[in-house]
Structure formats: C-alpha cells, structure tokens
Amino acid sequence: MGDFQSRYEILAAIMGPPNTASFKEEEHSGSQTKNYPVVVKCIQEHDPVDTTNVLVADDLDSNFEPFSITDDYGKYENTLVSHSSTILNEPYNESPSSSSSDSSSRSTSPFSQLSSQSLRLNAEEIAPSSLINKAVQSTLRLSEPLVSPIKCPLSEQFINFINQQDSDKVVLIRGFLLPHLASLTTKNVSEPELDKLRHSLYNWWVSILRRLQSNISTSERITYTKAILAIAKHHCWNKVEHSALLYLEHQLILYDTLTFVVHLLSQKSLPYSLTTFCASILVLSFFQLPLFADHFLSALDVKKKYIDALGSSFDEKIMIISHKYLAPFFTDQFSSTMHPYYPKRTSTPFTIGYNRQPIEFTRAWMRRFKSSTGGFFFEFLSCYHSFLALQFSFELPDNVIYFAPGYICLHAYLLELTISVIHISDKKPLMLPTGHEQFPCKTLPEVNPSMEEYNPKMPVTATTLSTLQQFVGHIKDAFKKIGDCRQEQMRLLAVLEQVLINVAKNTPAFNLQSCFLLCSLVEQCFGVFNDFSHRFDFSFWISVAKRLISTSHNMSIVRSITFIYAVWPYLDIKSKELVTLQWLLEENTFQELFLHWSPLVRAYFQRLVCWRFLKLDDMEEFQFKGTVTLRVKNLLKHYFTAQALYHEECLVNGRASPITKPSEPVPMRRLTIVCNHYQNYGNSESTEFELSNYKQDDGTIQALVTDVVSISNSFSSGLKKAFGSLFKNVSGLPAETEIAYHHTLSASNSYVFTDLVDNPDSMLKSTLKYRFVFKFSPSQPLSSLGKNKEKYDALLERSSHGVLPVQSKMLLYNSNHISCPLSSIKGVSVNGKRLVYTSRALVEWALVVNEFDHALSLRKGNETEDMEAPTLTVRIPKSYASNIYN
C-alpha cells in the first residue's frame, strides 16, 4: 500500500506537470472549442487507463437539458464496489471511488473533443500500464490505518450510494450526508484522520457532480447542489495545501465544478435553483483556485476612476497594516488583488494545467454580472461576504476588511452598476465645493444651461422605476443572506453608503431624470439602512439637496423637497436640526421657498413644513419641535407684517391690491390625495403610480375642493387601474359610501374645510391603515368654481398671529421656548419681487394647516403621535413637461 508521496508521484507521472507541452500545442491548434462539463467514461478494474476516453455532452438549451451518462457508468459503479469491498474491514478506511482514477483519466481536455487526433494523449506513452494500475489501486486506499477501530460512516454510506437507484441516492443524501456534514467536526482530529476524511469527501464530490450533470429532476438537482456546497464549504478543506496529493485532488474537482458552473452560466436561461450554487462555486474558486481572482477581476473590467473613488474613502494608513492582519487568512497569491489593485487586461484563458480545458471569460457567461436587474452579481456579492464572515475573526481593526482580495474592486463594480441604473451622462457633477449655500443669480451660465443639457425626456417611466425597485430589491436580499453575521452586514452597509455618495458626485445636476432616480434610490436605501440599524451621515445629502435647489429649476426644487419629506422618519435629532434650524427655516432659505413664484414649489414646501417639521411624532422631540414651532410662527408673523405694509403701499400709489386667491399648483391640474393600502405596499415612502390623462366621469360629486389641494372621491379608469379595489378617499372609506353623504354638502362649503359627514365618529378607524399620496390628476380650472374673496381675506387675517396646526399650539404652552435663541429671527426684509406672492402664500398656508387639522379630526381621541404622515411624491405631468421646454 503506497503512501501519499508515492501516490502523488504516480499521479504526476500520469498527468504530467501543470503546463505540458502537448497542452500548449492544443492552445495553438486553431480549432474552435467549446467549454463543457466533464463526464468521464470509466473503465473496468483491470483495464488500462486511456485518458482519451472522455465523453462530451451536447449544449444545454434554454430548457436546461443536462449532460448524458453512458452505459459505462454501471461499470464504474461495479468497479467501485469491487474495490471498496476489499477494504471495508479496515478501521476508518475511506471508501474508494473512481474520483482518483478520474483525475488521471481526465488528463486530456474533458470539455471538448480535439479536432486533431495527433493532439490526443496516450496514457501508455506517459506511463506504463503497470504503473497506471498501481496508481489506481493506490488512490483507492489510504496508507495509514487509524488507531480507532470505529468504521467511517462516510465510506460505508458511499458504497450504498453507488449501488442504489437514482431516487434512493437522493434519499440517502437528504437523510444521511447533509445531516452528517452539518454535525461533522474536525476538532481534535489528527492529520492522518483528516486526510482520510478529505479523500472520502472528495469521492462523494466527484460522484455527486457526475449525477448533477445527468438528466435529473429539479428536486434532485436542488439536493445535489446542496450536497456539493456542503462538501465544498466544509472546514476540513482548510489548509489542505499541506498535503500535496489531497490539494491536487481538491484543485482538480473544484476546477471541474467551476467548469460546469461556467457552462450553466453560458446558457440562455439559468434555473433559479442553480443561482446560489453557481455564485457559491465562483466565490470558492475566487479564493481557492490560484490566479482565478486575477482573471475574474480583469474580466469585470472595472473603470479605474470608480476604484479610485471608492478606495479614497478609506484611510491609506490602514493599507500599511492590512497585510499584517490578512496574511494568516490568505496566501501570497492574493497579494496582487489587494488594494490598491487595478485589474490588468489579459487575453490568456484561465487554467490550472494538468490538461484541463482552459476557462475563457467570454461574454456568454460574464453577461450575467453586467445586468443590474438580473441579480446574479448581488448573489455573488452576498456569497463573497458570507465567505469573509466565516474566514475573518471579529478582532480585526477597523477598515482592514476593505483591503481583502478584490474587496475594493468588487464594490467599485457595484458603484458602476448603480450609476448605470440611473442612466448617468458625463456632464456637470452634482456637488459643488463646500460652502455653496446661497442661491445663484440668474446670470451664472451653470444656472441657465443650454436646452440640450435639460434633457426634455422628463417623465420617469414605469420601466425605469421598475428597474430601480428591482435593483434595490437585490440589495435587500444581499443583506438578508448575510444576516447570520452582523459585523459583515455593518461592513457592507458602510460600503453601500460610500457607493451612494459617489453616485451623487457623478450625477449631472441638470439631468432631471437622473436626479429623480438618484433621490428615489437614496430614499429606498435609507429604508434599508433603517431596517438594519445603520447610522448614516446626512450632512452630505443636505448638500445634495442644496445643490438641486440651487439650480433654480422648479422640478428639481420639488424633488429635493420630497426627498427631505421621504427620509425625515429616518433622521436623528441632530440631522433634523441641520435640516430645519440651520437650513430650510433659516430666513433667506425659507423666504426663497415659502414665497417662491411657482405655486407648485410653495405647495410642496408648505406640506413639508406642516407634516414633517411641525407634526409631533415622538415626545422625545418635544423640545426640538417647540423651537421649530416658534421659528415658523415668527417667520409667518414677519411675512404678514410685510404683506400689510405692501398692501398699504399699493393703496397709496394707486396700484391694484395684492391677490389673495390661492394659485393652482399646476395649470389646469390639481393635487389629488389618494390612498394605497398599507399592507400591500409596505413601508415604502415613495410609492409612485403614473396616472394617465382622463376625463372625470359624469355625475361625480366633488367632495372637498381647495385651491391648493383637492380631495377627489371620483372613480376613474386611471385610479382603478392603479389602485383597483384598494382605492380609498381621505377618510379611508370606500368612495361610494362617502359620495352619498356628499350630496348633502352645499356648494358654499366647497372652499372651506368642514366635516365630510354629519357624524364622522361613526365611520372612523381606531388605527390608520392607509397612507396618503399626493398625485396629479386633471380637473376643471378653479376660476370656474366661483368667487370667495371674503373667505380668502378671512384666512389671510388669521395670519396676523401666525397660523399653526392645532397639534403644534400645545408646544407653545411650554414657557421654556419663549426665550429660545434658535427660535428668533433677524427680521430680514422681504425681497420686493416676492411681496406680490406674500398674500397668496399665507392663504395657501392657512389651507394646508386646515388640511392637517382636518386629518387629525378624523382620529379617535388624541392618538396623534402614531398618525402616519401622507406620502409626498412627485411626478411630472407630460403636458406640463412639454410646456416647460417649448
């Protein structure tokens, strides 16, 4: 019985060195070959080994027809049994398989038939027949018996696995192999015992891989892939390189499995049951096959600017000590893939030698990494992080993990994919140097770019939103799959935050579609941060919102407002103070938005102030909200004083008095509040639907109409298509139920907020089950609804003391806020050009406050803290977008 060294020498004599001359001839033969998984035609026990007897299966079509097995498979099983029966009585002696002999019989290219017969290798020319038979017999046994008399269950069950039928094989794997591997440990196991265990698992691996390549059902395929992953990921393979023969066996079978995976990825469609299997094998090959990481990262072709952008986010001092901490986990072959690493383009295919067919990184299978919606890259990334979580200890210094093999390069590729999702063009960057807080004047060339830079393809279509939602869905799935390791989740969360920051830095400020999608992406990712308890730095995103507002483009300003509105629940007190007291409620900024010339901007900003800044969500924010309330009250009183002075000036100079009638947010349109079911759409803060143009149905009764926001109870084809049976009105009741009550409402109440029904308490819910969404929908012009100047004047008169929501008034009862320095204002004079909008803005604000109070009145008792704020979203109407650019 030969020892391990003799077995290795015999195998090497049969296979030749890693790069044989005959293999090099094959590379230059010029024949067109295709990559296929290997199916070895096995031989009888005493037949000489012919390394040319290799079967190649046909291509897999879209229906995934696996490789066929020849009749010699039965001979292979009988051979295994005959060899295994002679060693069953040896204590803990691993059962034989054709795996070792397979290694010798696969010395030729196992994945394609050579076009030239002269290139085929003959085993007799490499080694004599007696030496080959000796190698086969040697690889079927292990040299040293164990001291323990206990038999190895893996060896015994492997013989049963060979002799059983196909269905029984699956039962054996489910009932024995998978549970046994889950409980199998290598603690206090000697090296000889560990080597025999590895060889036994190698036999299982080879046999299961052959079964996986055959024509099997989906359930069997899932079982076989789980078994291979359980074997390949088992910790017994750690430091297998110390044993030359076992390391060779492990490299060969892993390479064969990788070749099978590459063939699967090259098919037109990949079964979902094989996605995790393929990604896991690629990750194992990335870390365990020499030079595969270099070829793989080179094939991804990540741009250098993205690697630099992401790599610069981490401290370079950590790179100096990173090799010291990472050396115990990785061999020297990975030193070239650690940061800083820029993949070098290479045209040579990847191979481990031993006459294995090289793997070419063609578009046929690398295309799965290029798709941002396919999800395979995210599956690979989650498996990558899972592997690191198992390998690294928790005592590593901060940021050392970022210098692991391929870490920066892979996440730079994530940055590149993210940028491609929102269709970034190489134009002006979004961010300006720090300190750019003032609104630019109209003469700056960057404020008034050419018409080409505006990109008039305005509406964000359902396709782009669907792509974005799929992208974020893959990100969420990646975090869930590494849920067993909280530290690895935190590392990926930190990298994702840096990815989003770099995406914003590469976003053109005047490409509205990119800006819209960027805001939607960040809003959803902030929800991911909140779900996984990641604290992010919001100061950068405040500068992003400032940059959008500084463009002076109406829709960019509206999108920045809705962005703040959507992410508000995820902010801490410090971030909320930065948004309110140090930015939006600062005198100049508040005047710019509250008295903006566009009624659409005013409508959105006023709802941001009312529903977010003044609404009390948590009693812990009582002090902060009191300061904000006083600041808003003082600003409103200041604007009313300015309006009164301007009104007197107009009377003295004989000019027309300022108009008090509110303006429509969008010409010939109104904002409509509709409801989407809370359970159906989850916690999304930006659920959006595109409502097409349609005419109001005849007989529809207008329930409640205001000049800034209108609450529509009409059923239309567009609303039915978007919401179906879940369509509700503002009270959360079916529209038909309330329309009956609305017949009793007089036309005189159309412009004031009154109870929708005579007895609203009878139909109220104790908890809010729907969240509201502001939407555009067509309506008749407000001018046709009648004149109610007296009511507008009454609303304006109330502004003399500052109109505040009822809920906010309780904050003023706390005397500690009276002398709060942050609540005072400097009394900045109102710009003369904006005085004309003061009266309208104050009336519109009063209507917004009434709208808020009316929603609170629909709540039972005083349960206002848990009340959901409306989801404020924006979609640019097509007609409005076309009018902007024409």
From Swiss-Prot:
Swiss-Prot/TrEMBL keywords: Membrane, Transmembrane, Transmembrane helix
Bias type Low complexity, positions: 95-112
Membrane topology: Multi-pass membrane protein
Region of interest (Disordered), ranges: 87-112
Chief place where the protein resides: membrane
Keyword Glycoprotein on entry: no
GO cellular component, one term: membrane
Transmembrane among keywords: yes
Pfam families: DUF1765
Transmembrane segments: 277-297, 374-394, 400-420
Database matches in InterPro entries: UPF0592 (IPR013887)
A single GO molecular function term of this UniProt record: MAP-kinase scaffold activity
Record localization: Membrane
Membership in a protein family: Belongs to the UPF0592 family.
Name of the protein described by the UniProt record: UPF0592 membrane protein C7D4.03c
Classification of source organism: Eukaryota, Fungi, Dikarya, Ascomycota, Taphrinomycotina
